[in-house]
Structure formats: C-alpha cells, structure tokens
UniProtKB/Swiss-Prot annotation:
<dbReference type="GO" id="GO:0032324">
    <property type="term" value="P:molybdopterin cofactor biosynthetic process"/>
</dbReference>
<dbReference type="Pfam" id="PF00994">
    <property type="entry name" value="MoCF_biosynth"/>
</dbReference>
<keyword id="KW-0808">Transferase</keyword>
<comment type="pathway">
    <text>Cofactor biosynthesis; molybdopterin biosynthesis.</text>
</comment>
<dbReference type="GO" id="GO:0006777">
    <property type="term" value="P:Mo-molybdopterin cofactor biosynthetic process"/>
</dbReference>
<dbReference type="InterPro" id="IPR036425">
    <property type="entry name" value="MoaB/Mog-like_dom_sf"/>
</dbReference>
<dbReference type="GO" id="GO:0005829">
    <property type="term" value="C:cytosol"/>
</dbReference>
<comment type="function">
    <text>Catalyzes the adenylation of molybdopterin as part of the biosynthesis of the molybdenum-cofactor.</text>
</comment>
<comment type="similarity">
    <text>Belongs to the MoaB/Mog family.</text>
</comment>
<dbReference type="InterPro" id="IPR001453">
    <property type="entry name" value="MoaB/Mog_dom"/>
</dbReference>
<keyword id="KW-0547">Nucleotide-binding</keyword>
<dbReference type="GO" id="GO:0061598">
    <property type="term" value="F:molybdopterin adenylyltransferase activity"/>
</dbReference>
<keyword id="KW-0067">ATP-binding</keyword>
<keyword id="KW-0501">Molybdenum cofactor biosynthesis</keyword>
<protein>
    <recommendedName>
        <fullName>Molybdopterin adenylyltransferase</fullName>
        <ecNumber>2.7.7.75</ecNumber>
    </recommendedName>
</protein>
<dbReference type="GO" id="GO:0005524">
    <property type="term" value="F:ATP binding"/>
</dbReference>
<dbReference type="InterPro" id="IPR008284">
    <property type="entry name" value="MoCF_biosynth_CS"/>
</dbReference>
Length: 197
C-alpha cells in the first residue's frame, strides 16, 4: 500500500496542557520520526490533560475520524493517581499487544530501576496501532531506539523496530526506517522486494 502514513502524537500532561511549562514530548517525537522514517508522513498533534475521558476521546478521534495508522502517546504512564493514559488506551482497544509494554520496560530497566513502575501498553484499535511512551524526552528516544553501546551497536532492540511490520500486518501500510537510527525488522517474505514479485 502506498498511502501516506498518518501519525497521531498525543502529549498527556496537566501542567503542559495548562501552559505551566512547554510540552517536550511532541517536539521530541516529531524530531525522532523525521530522523527515523524514510517515507513521508502527516502528523496530527494533541496536547491534553491527564483526564481519562479526554484521553479516550482523543484516541478515538485520531483513529476513527482522522484515520491515523499509528498513535504515539507520551506521559501519564506511572502509578500516580493522575497517570491514566494506559487505562484510557486499554478502554478504547480492540486487542492488546503486550510485547510492546514488556519491551519498553526491558529497555528502560537498562537506565533506571524505576522502569518497573511504568504501565505503558500497546494496543490495536480497528486498523491502527496505539503505543504509550514515557513522558521524558530522553526516555522516549531510548524506548524507540533501544539500548546501544558506545560504538552504536544495538544491545537491546527498541520497540520501533517492530512497528513497521506490525502496521503492515494490521492495515497493509508499508513503511521503512533508516537503519542508522532504528532498523526495522520484517520476515524476508514480507519485504518489499519479495512482495513485488
């Protein structure tokens, strides 16, 4: 499929949405996607408070009305009472993709022991993938790219290595990444050169 990739970026923060401080999640995600993706894409961005009904409605709007293939949230994934992003995400899900949350925690544990407090989830709604990411810019990049040594060799794969193939499976969209940022994985039979035969 050659449709333009549509990505929703949702920053969940009471203080940033109230203007107390500048949101850092959406700019970090946008910059990373511009570096990592080969294919052109369109962004829909939302900055919202930590309110479960608002998060649920925003996710539904991005998938159901805006037609986003991929929605990345940032913030609100911890154990505090106001951290309800995973709860809202699960509430709008058709299917859960537990491997994404497991891998995010695995990556983050290489940097901070408090990664076990994270409740990030990955889900499918209709033909879209929704992923909860951490709120801190450094942690966002680490989660997406994985753990690398000083020479840049990947020690633990980041979650985005599985995103292109997941999108291909759920909605037929084929996207590529720049291997120097994140190498996407798909079986040989699902690679473009074999699909075009």
């Amino acid at each position: 499929m050659t449709a333009l990739l549509k990505i929703g970026l949702v920053s969940v923060s009471d203080r940033a949405s109230a203007g107390v401080y500048q949101d850092q999640g959406i700019p970090e995600l946008q910059a990373w996607l511009e570096q990592a993706l080969v294919d052109p894409f369109h962004l829909e961005t939302r900055l919202i408070p930590d309110e479960q009904p608002v998060i649920e409605q925003t996710l539904k709007e991005l998938v159901d009305e805006q037609g986003c293939h991929l929605v990345l949230t940032t913030g609100g994934t911890g154990p505090a009472k106001r951290d309800v992003t995973p709860d809202a995400t699960l509430a709008v899900a058709d299917r859960e993709m537990p491997g994404f949350g497991e891998q995010m925690r695995q990556v983050s544990l290489h940097f901070v022991p408090t990664a076990i407090l994270s409740r990030q989830v990955g889900v499918i709604r209709k033909e879209s993938l929704i992923l909860n990411l951490p709120g801190q810019p450094k942690a966002i990049k680490e989660t997406l790219e994985g753990v690398k040594d000083k020479e840049g060799n990947v020690l633990v794969k980041g979650i985005f290595s599985a995103v292109p193939y997941c999108l291909q499976l759920i909605n037929g969209l084929y996207i590529d990444t720049k291997p120097e940022i994140i190498e996407s994985f798909r079986p040989k039979s699902a690679r473009r050169e074999n699909l075009e035969k």
